[in-house]
Amino acid sequence: MPSTPPKAKWTPMSVADALGLRALVLLKDRQFCILSGVLLLAMIPLQWYMNYCSVYLDEVKFTYLSATYNLGTAAELGFMLLLPLMFKKMSFKSIMLIGLGALVFRYACFSAAAISGIRAFDLGAILIHGLIFGIVIVGVQLHAAELAPPELRNQAQGYVMTLSAGVGNLLSVALFGFLVLPLFKVSDKLHDWTVPYLISFGLAVLAMILFAVLYKAPKKLDNK
C-alpha cells in the first residue's frame, strides 16, 4: 500500500477534502484523464451489478442465492490477497486489463444466461466479482496514490471513490434504472434482461479497448 499521510493536525476537514476534489489538479495530465474516463465508463456496468443483480437473480428464481453470494465473498477475499503480489510482479496496465477483461467476462456470462436460461453462467458472473472490484476500484486507488505527490495521495484515493461509488453509480442508475429497465419490463415484476446485459457487455468491451489503446503509464504527477 502506498503511503497516504493525513492532512496536518488540527487542519479543518472540508467537503472538497472528503470527496477528494483537490486531486482534480491531477487531471491536467492526459493519462490521468484517460484513466479517470475509463474508470467512469467501467463503473456504469460495474455499479449496475451492485444495484440490480439481486433483482435479476430473484426474478429468474436463482437457487441457493445466499450460498452463491457467500462463495462470491470468499472469492473476493482471495483476489484481494493476490492484489499486492500482482502489483509487485506486473505493470498496472496489465493488471487493469485483467480487471476489465473480467468485467467483460461477467457480462458475457450474464448475457449468455439471459439468452439461454442456463444458470451456471450466472454463477460464473458472480464468482468473478472479487477480481473486478479488487482491480478496477482498489487497484486504481492504489495506482492513483502512487502517481500523486505525497500531499495529494489521500485526495487521489478519495477522488477515485467519488468517481466510482458516486458519479459512476449515479450514471448507472440513470441509464439502467430510469431508461433501460423500464423499456424492457414485461410485467409488474419481470423484465427481459437480455438487452440490458448486452448493453453492459458493450460498455465493458469499450472501456477495455479504450484503456488498451490510449493509456500509457504516466510519470509521477505533481500539483503545480
Whereabouts are the PLM-identified features?
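Multi-pass alpha-helical transporter architecture, strongest
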Residues: M1-P2, L198-K224
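Helix-loop boundary and gating motifs at the non-cytosolic
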Residues: Q31-V60, Y64-N70
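A late C-terminal transmembrane helix in Major Facilitator Superfamily
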Residues: E151-F184
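Helix-to-loop junctions at the C-terminal end of transmembrane segments
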Residues: F79-F92, V180-L181
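C-terminal ends and interior cores of transmembrane alpha-helices
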Residues: A102-S116
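Juxtamembrane intracellular "pre-TM" segments in multi-pass secondary transporters
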Residues: P2-S36
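Intracellular juxtamembrane helix-capping segments at the cytosolic ends
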Residues: I135-P149
